[in-house]
């Protein structure tokens, strides 16, 4: 199904069946592929489907609900002020969203019935974009969010499940390259419930025009959390964890003209926490509450500027807890 060179067209889809290939192309403005509370259908059910949505222009909308296994789903929007929503239910699905433009809103979701082994990839290029990505309930899912060439962007990630791998990038590509035209004022928020998840947040601003903010809220055990901020702007990092045996690494790197602030609060046993702050003015507040197993803290602050930290901990382990602080 293809429509091209058009304005204000609406497409309603209600598809049921297996092994189906569907492609929808829209070129113009104010076009809609309806569904998910925008009214209309845009529902696809069945296994082994390949579904592709392409929209070029401004003020377009794609809203789709899918159900099935082994699906290949792709959504691309090129333009400004577009909206996209993709809600997936099922196992072993691949979801890909690629947005190029400014002031766009995208929401991707892995279903609410214990959906497992899905791959979700979201790539955004542009300014003033908002991204919501959710694993409502499921295990062993992979989520990768990359936001390039931007300022004033917002990413919200929610995960409920175990053994998920989640990465969010702002200003840094997965291959390690850094955007030279990325100006900061970006935010990432995580809310994670579950065990044995691997979670990584990366932010880079290269021109020093704005700051970066990351906040991680985690409930569960044996999670690995990596939080990295670098560049010329101010950095704020916040991590709150309720659970046992979590591994936390927070790294901030700037220059002599900006500020870095880290706040880590962990309630549970047997955590390993590494905090690294380099250059700029540093402040680190760390609160570790412990009811049994020992925790380990390694804090390093390197700078010619101000360096301050506060440490609050409760350690009931008979062998003690390990704390190392280096300032130079």
Spans of features found by a protein language model:
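Low-complexity repeat regions of mature extracellularly deployed or surface/particle-associated proteins
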Residues: 8-328
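Gram-negative bacterial Sec-dependent N-terminal signal peptides
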Residues: 1-8
């Amino acid at each position: 199904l293809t429509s091209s060179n058009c304005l204000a067209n609406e497409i309603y889809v209600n598809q049921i069946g297996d092994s189906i290939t569907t492609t929808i192309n829209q070129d113009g403005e104010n076009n809609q592929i309806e569904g998910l509370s925008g009214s209309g259908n845009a529902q696809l059910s069945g296994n082994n489907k390949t579904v592709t949505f392409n929209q070029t222009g401004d003020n377009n909308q794609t809203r789709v609900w899918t159900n099935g296994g082994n699906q290949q789903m792709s959504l691309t929007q090129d333009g400004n002020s577009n909206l996209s929503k993709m809600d997936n239910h099922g196992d072993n699905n691949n979801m890909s969203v690629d947005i190029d433009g400014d002031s766009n809103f995208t929401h991707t979701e892995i279903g609410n019935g214990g959906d497992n082994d899905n791959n979700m990839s979201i790539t955004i290029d542009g300014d003033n974009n908002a991204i919501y990505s959710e694993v409502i309930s499921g295990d062993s899912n992979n989520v990768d969010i990359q936001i390039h060439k931007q300022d004033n962007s917002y990413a919200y990630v929610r995960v409920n499940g175990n053994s998920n791998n989640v990465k969010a990038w702002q200003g840094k590509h997965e291959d390690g390259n850094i955007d030279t035209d990325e100006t900061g004022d970006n935010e990432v928020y995580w809310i994670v419930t579950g065990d044995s998840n691997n979670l990584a947040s990366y932010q880079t601003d290269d021109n020093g025009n704005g700051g970066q903010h990351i906040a991680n809220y985690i409930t569960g055990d044996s999670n690995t959390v990596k939080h990295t901020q670098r560049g010329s702007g101010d950095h704020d990092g916040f991590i709150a964890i309720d659970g046992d045996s979590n591994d936390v690494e927070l790294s901030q790197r700037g220059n002599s003209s900006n500020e870095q602030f880290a706040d880590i609060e962990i309630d549970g046993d047997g955590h390993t926490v590494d905090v690294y702050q380099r250059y700029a003015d540093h402040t680190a507040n760390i609160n570790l509450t412990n009811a049994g197993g020992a925790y380990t803290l390694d804090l390093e602050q390197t700078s010619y500027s101000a360096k301050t930290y506060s440490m609050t901990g409760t350690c009931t382990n008979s062998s003690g807890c390990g704390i190392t602080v280096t300032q130079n």
